[in-house]
């Protein structure tokens, strides 16, 4: 019999023995066994530890929440920043897979190891990002096109995460070679109809999540937009699958790819650095 939300709250109190709680919820929701790598049943863990991310400001609400249990979300894109599934919902719990995201409005994160909650709260003059400490990418890459308005926020180093690179890239279903990475986040901003530069060089694993506006992640056979062969539409709250493949120890091969902003857009970069 499904467990109601009220019963969930009652039964998940710290007075329950961990083993009893585990058995109770696993019988009702078998997929909870997937959460074994992260023990959110431990009552000694500080739940819902929250802080602002480095790029939070009056225009963008951006929070990191760790050891998440029954966390209410009024309106935000929620990104699962861990190798274990995130559980959302109340009467009808649902899974957000590792490194994926959803858009919650009056929703709840029932359990997660680590999550980012991000929303543009003030769209007017959002394009003034360069005057709020964001950096034009051409200041960092000499070869970057001088006429491309692509801006990067401050980067936030979140902490360490252990994951098998081939599981991250969907090349393997079972972890056989876990590795520790440093998890880093930053935002990007571009106005509509911006070509954000075709490239294929990254010394890290990455995925992206759309926070505001509409864009696309695109793949090419050559560094030429006429060779487009895959067009991944990015609506708000969407995270694409990893583009790279593991080709050696700390070696990732990316296809030629770019982000294209259809409208004024803000998107999140999730980077795993070896």
Language-model regions, residue ranges each:
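Short, surface-exposed beta-edge/turn micro-motifs
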Residues: 73-77, 112-116, 204-206, 265
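Short acidic-glycine-tyrosine-enriched beta hairpin
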Residues: 85-107, 222-258
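N-terminal ordered "arm"
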Residues: 53-92
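Short, surface-exposed secondary-structure edge patches
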Residues: 68, 207, 230-232
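A short, N-terminal "cap"/entry segment at the start of jelly-roll beta-barrel domains
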Residues: 2-66, 114-184
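Conserved short histidine dyad/triad with adjacent acidic residue
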Residues: 61-64, 184-205, 219-224, 234, ...
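Short, conserved beta-strand element in jelly-roll/cupin
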Residues: 78-82, 202-221
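A short hydrophobic beta-strand segment most commonly corresponding to one strand
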Residues: 114-123, 253-274
